[in-house]
């Protein structure tokens, strides 16, 4: 039973990535090693972020249950490094914009999935007692994949030299929202004392709105040119 539960969680977390890779056409371009390089860039960026946070933002020692809004906001600002990392990955790949976006997003999201969820699923989902948090973790990995696709598309649009002026503001706003999404989520959860399923639903809704807005801008920009 425990192995069956682990298999379900593993399939829910990893199969959408495999299906996306196969159905997006990346496999036809032999983009596997490009995605691996994007994943390696993710690891380097996260290491730099960890060193920076450990140096300039030590653990906050406030009251129990209190939330350091200013400190967490400053920490969320460090996620700007993720945008720079995605831009670096896309700038090193030749090809159409769609290809660059998919390679960067797949490599980035897969590296995060392996590094942050593989071990917890292997250790926890095989436990004797069933726990919904591993199902939630698997669903959250799918939300992260959609999130990074949207972020990669926004970075690609923002760095285009021929981006029309009237696109600059909405793209910048969406980039800011994507960068501070985790911080805003933590604020909502802390203020409204949300449960885990409610927080996951809110994250899915915010990611969906962000992704649909990004898709609208991307389609209008590509077709407009």
Swiss-Prot record:
Membrane topology, record value: Multi-pass membrane protein
GO cellular component, one term: nuclear membrane
Domain of life: Eukaryota
GO terms classed as biological process: multi-pass transmembrane protein insertion into ER membrane; protein localization to nuclear inner membrane
Keyword Lipoprotein: no
Ranges per topology, Cytoplasmic: 22-34, 91-100, 158-166, 219-225
GO MF terms, alphabetically ordered: ribosome binding
Cellular localization per UniProt: Endoplasmic reticulum membrane; Cell membrane
Keywords: Cell membrane, Endoplasmic reticulum, Membrane, Transmembrane, Transmembrane helix
Transmembrane segments: 1-21, 35-58, 69-90, 101-126, 132-157, 167-189, 197-218
Lumenal compartment spans: 59-68, 127-131, 190-196
Database matches in Pfam families: DUF2053 (PF09767)
Function recorded in the entry: Component of the multi-pass translocon (MPT) complex that mediates insertion of multi-pass membrane proteins into the lipid bilayer of membranes. The MPT complex takes over after the SEC61 complex: following membrane insertion of the first few transmembrane segments of proteins by the SEC61 complex, the MPT complex occludes the lateral gate of the SEC61 complex to promote insertion of subsequent transmembrane regions.
Family label: Belongs to the TMEM147 family.
Subunit structure: Component of the multi-pass translocon (MPT) complex.
Designated name of the protein: BOS complex subunit TMEM147
Annotated source species: Xenopus tropicalis
Gene: tmem147
């Amino acid at each position: 039973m425990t192995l069956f539960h682990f298999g379900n969680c593993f399939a829910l977390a990893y199969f959408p990535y495999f299906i996306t890779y196969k159905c997006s056409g990346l496999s036809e371009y032999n983009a596997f090693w490009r995605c691996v390089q994007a994943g390696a860039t993710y690891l380097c960026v996260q290491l730099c972020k960890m060193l920076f946070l450990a140096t300039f933002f030590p653990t906050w020692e406030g009251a129990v249950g209190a939330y350091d809004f200013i400190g967490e906001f400053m920490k969320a600002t460090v996620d700007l490094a993720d945008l720079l990392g995605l831009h670096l990955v896309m700038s090193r790949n030749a090809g159409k914009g769609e290809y660059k976006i998919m390679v960067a997003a797949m490599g980035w999201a897969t590296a995060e999935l392996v590094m942050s969820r593989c071990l917890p699923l292997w250790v926890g989902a095989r436990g004797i007692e069933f726990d919904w948090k591993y199902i939630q973790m698997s669903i959250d990995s799918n939300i992260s994949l959609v999130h990074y696709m949207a972020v990669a598309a926004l970075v690609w649009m923002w760095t285009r030299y021929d981006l029309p002026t009237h696109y600059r503001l909405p793209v910048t706003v969406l980039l800011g929202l994507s960068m501070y999404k985790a911080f805003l989520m933590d604020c909502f959860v802390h203020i409204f004392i949300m449960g885990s399923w409610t927080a996951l639903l809110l994250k899915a809704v915010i990611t969906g709105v962000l992704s649909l807005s990004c898709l609208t801008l991307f389609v209008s920009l590509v077709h407009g040119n």
